[in-house]
């Protein structure tokens, strides 16, 4: 969700828009990979159904809001370093995801610990369930989230000077993760199959990986997950020497 944070929601967005109107920050481009959760192997039906057909965007005051804020400021830093050629970012992100969803299933399966922690756990959870069971679990989860959102909104209305983080510490954080189901993007290797595949023939000069807190409950596996993720992406992009920059949170707590 940190990479997914859009420029339109960032503190300095209006300032950026004003400068774009003055034709500053030219030669910057972005492409947002459609966030495909699932492709039915039998019918080819894509979930969600309302995805837009994407294209390259030459950044201007009208479309800058939808680029990743981190992606934009990375491009800006490169441009201000003296690069005069066009600079482009391909936004391939989905908030609330484990590193395991971006790694090939065959790669996860090769490591006994990762196979047990991610693949086996997933398959054990969904075993023997029907689509009606999955829908029932999802409905119950959604009702829990809706109640949480109502409680949070009520608290913030009663305490308008309270920050969102403080309010969440009192009311509780958004219930997460949702229950596993075969068409949910949080399943192991899910977004490797539906999003990373969309750029497998692209040519890139560097990759930036930002991991939030989603793997904190399985932190002991991260020394295996991270190298495997880098291996998977380099292999998929046919570039064994692709530079990878790691932008990590220094720590996480319910402050």
Stretches found by the model and what they are:
Residues 1-255:
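Cell-envelope and extracellular/periplasmic
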């Amino acid at each position: 969700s940190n990479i997914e944070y859009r420029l339109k929601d960032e503190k300095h967005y209006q300032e950026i828009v004003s400068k774009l109107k003055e034709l500053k920050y030219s030669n910057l481009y972005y492409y947002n990979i459609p966030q495909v959760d699932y492709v039915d192997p039998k019918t080819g039906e894509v979930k969600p159904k309302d995805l837009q057909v994407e294209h390259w965007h030459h950044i201007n005051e009208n479309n800058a809001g939808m680029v990743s804020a981190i992606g934009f400021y990375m491009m800006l830093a490169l441009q201000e370093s003296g690069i005069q050629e066009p600079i482009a970012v391909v936004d391939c992100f989905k908030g609330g995801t484990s590193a395991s969803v971006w790694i090939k299933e065959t790669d996860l399966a090769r490591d006994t610990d990762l196979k047990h922690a991610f693949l086996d756990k997933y398959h054990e959870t969904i075993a023997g369930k029907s689509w009606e069971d999955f829908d029932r679990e999802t409905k119950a989860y959604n009702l829990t989230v809706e109640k949480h959102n109502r409680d949070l909104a009520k608290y913030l209305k009663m305490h308008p000077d309270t920050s969102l983080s403080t309010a969440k510490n009192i009311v509780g954080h958004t219930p997460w993760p949702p229950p596993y189901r075969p068409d949910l993007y949080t399943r192991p290797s899910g977004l490797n199959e539906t999003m990373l595949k969309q750029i497998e023939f692209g040519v890139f000069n560097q990759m930036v990986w930002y991991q939030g807190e989603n793997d904190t409950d399985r932190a002991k596996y991260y020394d295996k997950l991270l190298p495997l993720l880098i291996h998977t992406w380099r292999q998929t992009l046919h570039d064994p020497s692709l530079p990878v920059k790691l932008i990590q949170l220094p720590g996480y707590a319910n402050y």
